[in-house]
Amino acid sequence: LYNVLKITSLEELREAAETGRLREIPRMGEKAERNILDGIAKSLARRGIPIVRAMALTESLAGQLGRQNGVRRALMAGDCRRYREMCDGISVVLVSDKPARALAQAASSFSNADVLEASDSLLRVRSEFGEISVWAEEPGHAGSALARATGSARHTAALERIAREKKLSFVETRLLDESGAPVAAPDEQSFYGLLGLPYIAPEIREGQGEIEAALAGRLPELITIEDIAGDLHMHTVASDGVGTAA
């Protein structure tokens, strides 16, 4: 690409594919152009932090914050816990008897970051790695906090709706009863149970029908590493191959 067309950027590659200039290169035809344009479109649509990088950053941050005085546990949450291929940011939940103090200590770790939001239960900053959310709650509400920090916006909105149907409120990191008193949910199993739901695995908390499936007793069984017997890789006419799978 560089030797023939002097292409040095993604934008130049897209322009060459759109104008037909790629065909100046041997064995580059219409099919190759289409595949390149499709690949560029997918790449641009998946901006964010790759899951491998996000996982490493989250584990490092959780390890650092988990060593703070008064922090019992530091748990992975957000896109990373849902194993999104590309993560919008990283999230950690701190379990502490004094959550506000835990967040104040965490804030000192981000002295060079822009603070986007700060409350007694959430610290959200923009750093060189992207957006970072640090939640904090008491042990008795760790389950509701982790559920809040893990699910997608659509999933948590559905949980809020179901809570209202149960005469409860799901506000920030806690469940509240009709009087406004907090309802304990020390783990996610108890949190979902209070809403009349079975435990929903983080990987499917996307607001794409998992709530309805849970209510109907039709949650899918997730594939685990023990289920994988091998890896099959092939190129067919569906991509850049010349034969079919048959």
Give the positions of each predicted feature:
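Accessory alpha-helical DNA-binding modules that contact the DNA backbone or grooves
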Residues: 1-90, 94-123, 127-130, 143-144, ...
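Residue-level marker of alpha-helix boundaries and capping positions
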Residues: 52, 150, 239-242
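Conserved active-site and cofactor/substrate-binding residues in soluble primary-metabolism enzymes
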Residues: 56, 154, 243
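A short acidic-to-branched-hydrophobic micro-motif
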Residues: 131-138
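Short, solvent-exposed helix-loop connector elements
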Residues: 144-150
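Histidine-rich, glycine-flanked metal-binding segment
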Residues: 186-220
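An N-terminally biased module of ancient metal coordination in phosphate/nucleic-acid-related enzymes
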Residues: 213-246
